[in-house]
UniProtKB/Swiss-Prot annotation:
The keyword Ion transport does not apply. InterPro entries: Cyt_6/f_cplx_su5, Cyt_6/f_cplx_su5_sf. This is Cytochrome b6-f complex subunit 5. GO terms for cellular component: cytochrome b6f complex; plasma membrane-derived thylakoid membrane. It comes from the Bacteria.
Amino acid sequence: MIEPLLCGIVLGLIPITLMGLFVAAWNQYRRGSALEG
């Protein structure tokens, strides 16, 4: 049985991780487009 605390931590980390990856990709995309144009 999964502990509620552990479950809460996992459910809290997943969106943060996805948002972090999205921000990193967005920054890299902006930097690349800025260098091109």
